[in-house]
């Protein structure tokens, strides 16, 4: 796993591209927006270094393109306007490809398959969605978890849907009892709760999602990045990231391994 590092501005061109902090005065070739704190995709480790599956992936993409990469922290819901306005060149944060999003942005091919899930306090006695009647459910603003809860809240009779800007503040409220459950991407939640016995993922919510890098609509950079991702899949680099961050081998039939076409709106 790679931490974000800062190379000197005098570094020779023979070296690989630098991945730099957003606070650096050195201008990067590519500015990448990310909701830092989104484990295990992009977050700060105990040493304060920004690390994660997607950090490693985009750092390698930058190197293959011969471009330096700067990661800037953007709330998830702000990533869409940031990429459309040109403030950032691309966005990551386990962003799900949807037909609705494809109307206004472009995605490279997917590299991870996912579903949603429900996490609760282990002491709550809640065993799944059926136990959330009249309860407060937390979601990330603008996320597919937000969309799912909004579309299905009536069926499960949620008492309230409370929106957060990222996993960390939602987890704080869950532990404190201010929300009763939290709906979000299952890989992030399984990673987060693995060393927190007070929390428990109690139900997988099948949504058939795929994650990718997001660009402004029609940006030629998307095709360049897509080609590099194809190469990295063929070399086994993306599959190796899966083993590094999830401790398990990616199945051959998943988008982590299979080279796929860039998605287009239906």
Question: For each predicted feature, which ranges?
Answer:
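Bilobed "Venus flytrap"/periplasmic-binding protein-like clamshell domains
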Residues: 31-32, 36-39, 50-63, 96, ...
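Extended ligand-binding regions for polar small-molecule ligands
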Residues: 55-64, 126, 130-131, 135-136, ...
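Extracytoplasmic small-molecule ligand-binding "clamshell" domains
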Residues: 28-94, 103, 225
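A ligand-binding cleft/hinge motif common to bilobed small-molecule-binding domains
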Residues: 78-81, 93-103, 150-151, 173-207
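Sec/Tat signal peptide C-region and signal peptidase I cleavage site
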Residues: 20-29
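Short helix-initiation/N-cap motifs at beta->coil->alpha
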Residues: 55, 70-81, 124, 161-173, ...
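Ligand-binding clefts/hinges and TM-proximal coupling segments of bilobed small-molecule sensing domains
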Residues: 144-162, 201-202, 233-266
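Periplasmic-binding protein-like
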Residues: 35-36, 112-120, 186, 190-230, ...
């Amino acid at each position: 796993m790679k931490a974000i590092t800062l190379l000197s501005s005098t570094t020779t061109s023979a070296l690989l591209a630098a991945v730099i902090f957003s606070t650096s005065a050195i201008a990067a070739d590519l500015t990448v927006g990310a909701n830092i704190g989104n484990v295990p995709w992009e977050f700060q480790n105990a040493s304060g270094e920004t690390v994660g599956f997607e950090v490693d992936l985009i750092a390698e993409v930058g190197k293959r393109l011969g471009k330096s990469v700067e990661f800037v922290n953007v709330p998830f819901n702000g990533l869409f306007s940031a990429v459309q306005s040109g403030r950032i060149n691309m966005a990551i944060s386990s962003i799900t490809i949807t037909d609705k999003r494809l109307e206004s942005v472009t995605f490279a091919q997917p590299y991870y398959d996912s579903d949603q899930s429900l996490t609760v306090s282990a002491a709550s006695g809640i065993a799944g969605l059926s136990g959330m009647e009249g309860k407060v459910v937390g979601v990330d603003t603008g996320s597919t978890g937000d969309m799912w809860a909004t579309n299905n809240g009536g069926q499960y009779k949620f008492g309230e849907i409370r929106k957060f800007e990222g996993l960390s503040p939602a987890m704080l409220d869950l532990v404190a009892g201010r929300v009763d459950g939290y709906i979000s991407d299952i890989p992030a939640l399984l990673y987060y709760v693995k060393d927190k016995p007070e929390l428990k993922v109690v139900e997988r919510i099948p949504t058939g999602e795929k994650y990718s890098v997001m660009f402004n609509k029609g940006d030629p950079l998307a095709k360049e990045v897509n080609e590099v991702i194809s190469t990295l899949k063929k070399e086994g680099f993306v599959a190796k990231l899966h083993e590094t961050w999830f401790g398990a081998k990616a199945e051959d039939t998943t988008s982590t391994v299979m080279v796929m076409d860039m998605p287009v709106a239906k």
